[in-house]
A protein has these predicted regions:
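Solvent-exposed loop/turn segments flanking beta-strands in beta-repeat/beta-sandwich domains
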Residues: 87, 113-133
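Short, aromatic- and glycine-rich surface loops/edge beta-strands on solvent-exposed regions
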Residues: 37-45, 166-179
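Extracytoplasmic soluble-region selector
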Residues: 1-71, 117-119, 161-162
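Signal that preferentially marks extracellular ectodomain short beta-strand elements
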Residues: 28, 139-170
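Short acidic/polar inter-strand loop motif in beta-rich domains
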Residues: 48-50, 177-185
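Contiguous beta-strand segments within globular domains
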Residues: 87-115, 151
């Protein structure tokens, strides 16, 4: 109140990354469920302004086209990787520490499948992101090449969820492999780091 009269002091809320977070007129922040990352939230009233940094951690699992809907069951959260070297997948592309432009999403991840594996999980993880993709490893390019490799190419939405949340940063990429005939046990490749 001022002079016994109520005065409206509702601030104007803004964010610098509305693709990750929106703020209502009442100041309630809501994630968009499309990407994560660091967001600066600012409240302005007249000539006054205050800002705060908010970190949005985006986590979700995608079942890639071609993989059965129950494919994630091959990788229970409570399981740990096995030690059978013959079953372990191995990265072919990209090389560790590869840096990609954020707007180039047609990256074809490629790996040796390991013995008996037909289910694969790629997890892209940082302090802002945890995106898991479960796939059967089939891709037309790899099939045509006849190499027998497992492959995955992110869609634009998946790539944006990974890259936009980590500008000038990096993510760890883990690759797990399992067999549909023995769900619950899986093997893991060495971890990759990729940057943007």
């Amino acid at each position: 109140t001022r002079g016994g009269r109520a005065v409206d002091v509702t601030p104007l809320w803004t964010v610098d990354r509305p693709a990750a977070l929106t703020v209502s007129a009442a100041g309630l922040g809501t994630t968009t469920n499309t990407e994560g990352g660091d967001v600066v939230v600012t409240a302005r009233f007249g000539s006054l302004a205050a800002s705060a940094a908010v970190r949005v951690v985006f986590a979700y699992t995608v079942v890639a086209p071609g993989a059965p809907a129950d494919a994630p069951a091959a990788f229970p959260e409570t399981a740990t990787p096995g030690t059978d070297a013959a079953r372990a997948p191995a990265w072919v592309y990209p090389a560790n520490e590869t840096v990609f432009p954020q707007n180039v999403y047609k990256v074809l991840f490629q790996w040796r499948r390991g013995t008996g594996n037909d289910r694969f999980r790629l997890t892209f993880e940082s302090d802002r992101t945890r995106v898991s993709v479960v796939t059967d490893g089939a891709h037309p390019t790899c099939t045509m090449a006849g190499t027998g490799l497992g492959c995955f190419e992110p869609t634009l939405d998946v790539w944006r969820a990974i890259a936009a949340a980590n500008p000038r940063g990096s993510v760890r990429v883990t690759l797990d492999a399992a067999s549909s005939t023995a769900p619950g046990t899986f093997a893991r490749a060495s971890t990759l780091n990729i940057g943007f």
